[in-house]
Amino acid sequence: MRRAPHRFTGCAARASAACALIAACACSTRDPYDDLLWYYRPEPGSVIIPREQHGPRSLSMFHGTDGAPIDWNGLWNGIRWADIVIVGEQHDDTNAHEVQQAIWEETVAAWPGSAVSLEMLERDEQATVDAYLAGEIDAETFVERTGSRDWASKGTWDDFYQPVIDEAKQAKAPVIAANAPRDYVRRARTEGYDALAALPEAERAMFALPAKDPPASYRARFRDFMSGGGEREVDEARVDEVLRSQRMWDATMADSIVRAHERLPSHAKVVHLVGQFHSEYDGGLVSEIQARAPFARVLTVTVQKGTARALREEDRGKADVVVYGVAPRLRWTGFQAGLKPPAEERPAEEEAPAWGFAY
């Protein structure tokens, strides 16, 4: 005789499905704002500290997928969730550097032992970085030895990147020279990965080769960048050659980040500063991190030029958090405060440094 189904079977199935959903959220490594239980329920013993929001902390910010507005405290929740925080910049954008400095300042204060990693420094410069952190050389010598003074544009290092390194020095925190030396980047283009893989071990320590192919959209974006948005013809073989260099940048930075993450205390975080092309749309850098550390939780932040009161459609999907560079200002009309319309935007500069790719 056929047994009638137990009347609680449906409830049990729903409960099982709910548990599976919660487990899936808990295991998410890409979007902290999908983890609703985590986001709305503080950890036991934690406290909520209101932050005064001014300067870079007051800028307009939105969730990069659905456009929901967030504030600095919401961004901070994402940082708290993450193991690795990637902050993408346009190299000449002052607002982006102020956001990076604020994120690093608060991260290293909240989680001592965290590390800051920079695209702008190369592995063969790590000894110079360490000498500066140890007080063996002064800032002027550090900048001279690394040739960094004009890295983003003439005379910008002192304002854009040195404050981050000085904050790390004061906090006794590691600074990671994450990138591959430019000679090896060039050789990736001219000689290919097989030739680099055959180099002696001491040289191979200066770079990492890609662990996986990037998303197909990454090459398409790179081709578009090389063609100036389709304004000029580009040779497809040339695109692939230059993309080899770009991918080795991504792989070496990812390898540096993951190595730092693995040797830091369990509570500590890695904050990586990088040109936004590398990290947007989960591009080459993020895919290389995931290939090397699939269980590391990665938060991506991108800072865009210009003002916005909502997520711009062209920025959807670029990062977990999209920040716009100028906060709307209040103006008074009678007894009501209203938002002052943003000034007319100037198109963002898209020129690359002479030695490579910018964004």
What are the functions of these language-model segments?
Residues 2-16:
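Bacterial N-terminal signal peptides that target proteins for export
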Residues 28-82:
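N- or domain-start disorder-to-order transition segments that initiate the globular core
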Residues 35-50, 252-255, 261-264, 268, ...:
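C-terminal regions of proteins
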Residues 57, 80-90, 141-148, 236:
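Acidic/histidine-rich, surface-exposed loop or edge segments in extracytoplasmic proteins
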Residues 67-68, 72-109:
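Zymogen propeptides
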Residues 90-93, 121-125, 181-185, 276-279, ...:
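Solvent-exposed loop/turn segments at secondary-structure junctions
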Residues 110, 115, 122, 126-260:
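A substrate-binding/cap region within the structured catalytic cores of diverse enzymes
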